[in-house]
């Protein structure tokens, strides 16, 4: 990943990924976009997750803009680098904050696509504890709330690295099971959805466990910030 990042971030926008990317299941994205109800794309910290957004923007940028959520760096210089590096045709970025959540909601209601990493640990109050590989992990509720509140389609995607620097395979798939849609109350529903989401991420990771970013502190305690509620996120 260290070797990939400079090339992905610093190459000219005119230099396409081209033959470095193979697609499996790309037609699922086309079908979802045809429905016109918005599309939520989820990828864990698996493979070259940075290439997913760029590849989607290159292939589908004429049809939709992809808004990808990211956590801004604390250092100003790095934050500026991230923003400039990710500013590419067909691709917008949304900070992991209230403004970014609203930005993604608006994009979905326009029928556009959004992307985020659902195994990223959210701030306290924006997730629930749910099993992940048999251990409790604080899991975001935003990903499934976006689907629930907008009626958007949901797909999973990850970029598998090929050996010898041959490129990547973008693997797109639907969830193995529909998300839970009924429960005793909203808290129970979000708990069930978080558990289902973690199961989906685990299924992807088992396809190539050596390519998962195990060094990411998935089981850490959430940081304390103001929690975003569903009412606040509504534009």
For each predicted feature, which ranges?
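A general structural motif
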Residues: 36-38, 63-65, 111
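Membrane-anchoring hydrophobic helices of lipid-metabolizing enzymes
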Residues: 1-43, 48, 80-83, 88-90
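A conditional alpha-helix N-cap/helix-loop micro-motif detector
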Residues: 19-22, 75, 94-98, 136-137, ...
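Non-catalytic C-terminal accessory region of glycerolipid acyltransferases
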Residues: 33, 58, 98-235
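Short beta-strand->loop
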Residues: 40-44, 56, 67-73, 140
């Amino acid at each position: 990943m260290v070797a990939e990042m400079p090339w992905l971030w610093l190459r000219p926008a005119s230099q396409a990924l081209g033959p470095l990317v193979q697609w499996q299941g790309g037609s699922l994205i086309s079908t979802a976009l045809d429905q016109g109800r918005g599309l939520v794309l989820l990828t864990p910290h698996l493979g070259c997750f940075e290439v997913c957004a760029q590849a989607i923007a290159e292939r589908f940028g004429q049809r939709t803009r992809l808004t990808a959520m990211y956590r801004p760096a604390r250092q100003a210089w790095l934050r500026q680098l991230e923003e400039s590096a990710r500013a590419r045709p067909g691709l917008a970025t949304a900070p992991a904050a209230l403004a970014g959540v609203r930005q993604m909601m608006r994009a979905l209601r326009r029928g556009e696509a959004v992307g985020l990493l659902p195994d990223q640990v959210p701030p306290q109050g924006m997730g629930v504890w749910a099993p992940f590989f048999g251990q409790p992990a604080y899991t975001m509720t935003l990903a499934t709330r976006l689907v629930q509140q907008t009626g958007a389609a949901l797909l999973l995607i990850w970029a598998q690295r090929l050996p010898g620097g041959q490129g990547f395979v973008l693997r797109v798939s639907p969830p193995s099971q529909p998300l839970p849609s009924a429960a005793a109350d909203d808290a129970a529903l979000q708990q069930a959805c978080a558990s289902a989401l973690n199961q989906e991420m685990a299924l992807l990771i088992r396809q190539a466990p050596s390519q998962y970013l195990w060094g990411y502190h998935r089981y850490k305690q959430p940081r304390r910030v103001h929690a975003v509620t569903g009412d606040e996120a509504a534009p």
